[in-house]
From Swiss-Prot:
Note: A longer mRNA that is not produced by splicing has been shown to be transcribed in barley and maize. It is not known if this mRNA is translated.
Organism: Zea mays (Maize)
Signal peptide range: none
Membrane topology note: Multi-pass membrane protein
PANTHER family with a match to the protein in the record: CYTOCHROME B (PTHR19271:SF40)
Any one of the GO BP annotations: photosynthetic electron transport chain
Protein name as catalogued: Cytochrome b6-f complex subunit 4
Main location class: plastid
Length: 160
């Protein structure tokens, strides 16, 4: 750890610079009014113009009309619900499935209390949290991929 030199506030040159506003609290130009009144509205209006331009030039197609009498064979949720859908689909008891879904965020909330870490550290110095993260990621990917397959191949991912 290096030795830091504290500024001498009795130095007349330093006092003159601080009096002119050249101290630690003066960095570049102020945000008001330059950024907030001139730059931000241009960026916001430019973003809105790009979105409107893309919507006008390349509109998304509406698709086929809905038919309430023709239901697809299997209804799948959005991709980020695939692991939860797979848990509910494979567990025979509904209460157990709901408890398993509740246990995931509960388990994630307990991870910081498992290790005695007061500040951010290298992941290699936090083996429990790193292991929980890696296993959780692998299980979420496994469940997510399995949710897209038929029920008889979902647990083995069709490999066995």
């Amino acid at each position: 750890m290096g030795v830091t030199k504290k500024p001498d506030l009795n130095d007349p040159v330093l006092r003159a610079k601080l009096a002119k506003g050249m101290g630690h609290n003066y960095y570049g130009e102020p945000a008001w009014p330059n950024d907030l009144l001139y730059i931000f509205p241009v960026v916001i209006l430019g973003t809105i113009a790009c979105n409107v331009g893309l919507a006008v030039l390349e509109p998304s197609m509406i698709g086929e009309p809905a038919d309430p009498f023709a239901t697809p064979l299997e209804i799948l949720p959005e991709w980020y619900f695939f692991p939860v859908f797979q848990i509910l689909r494979t567990v025979p008891n509904k209460l157990l499935g709901v408890l398993l879904m509740v246990s995931v965020p509960t388990g994630l909330l307990t991870v910081p209390f498992l290790e005695n870490v007061n500040k951010f550290q290298n992941p290699f110095r936090r083996p429990v949290a790193t292991t929980v993260f890696l296993i959780g990621t692998a299980v979420a990917l496994w469940l997510g991929i399995g949710a897209t397959l038929p029920i008889d191949k979902s647990l083995t991912l069709g490999l066995f």
